[in-house]
Amino acid sequence: MSYQQQQCKQPCQPPPVCPTPKCPEPCPPPKCPEPCPPPKCPQPCPPQQCQQKCPPVTPSPPCQPKCPPKSK
């Protein structure tokens, strides 16, 4: 048998397994800029302080003409 024939009788070798191609790393998601802080509202005006309630007006007693003391 020639050398070539003998080689042919060898069981076929499975084709070499190709290593799976290494995928490139997926791109990281784009970095979003920091969201704007909410606009700072001006301080709300403090509630207007109500004016002090006037004390109820006491009706002045009816005028009594003051009689001058009678001189004796």
From Swiss-Prot:
One matching Pfam family: SPRR2
Record region (Disordered): 1-20, 42-72
Start-end of Pro residues biased regions: 56-72
Molecular-function GO terms, alphabetical: structural constituent of skin epidermis; structural molecule activity
Example of a GO biological process term: peptide cross-linking
InterPro entries (alphabetical): SPRR2
Region span, 3 X 9 AA tandem repeats of P-K-C-P-[EQ]-P-C-P-P: 21-47
Entry's induction text: During squamous differentiation of epidermal keratinocytes.
Sequence repeat start and end residues: 21-29, 30-38, 39-47
Disulphide-bonded residues: none
GO cellular component, one term: cytoplasm
Location of the protein in the cell: Cytoplasm
Keywords: Cytoplasm, Keratinization, Repeat
Extent of Low complexity compositional bias: 1-11
Known role: Cross-linked envelope protein of keratinocytes. It is a keratinocyte protein that first appears in the cell cytosol, but ultimately becomes cross-linked to membrane proteins by transglutaminase. All that results in the formation of an insoluble envelope beneath the plasma membrane.
Similarity comment: family membership: Belongs to the cornifin (SPRR) family.
Protein name in the entry: Small proline-rich protein 2E
Origin species: Homo sapiens
Lineage of the species this protein comes from: Eukaryota, Metazoa, Chordata, Craniata, Vertebrata
Designated gene of the protein: SPRR2E
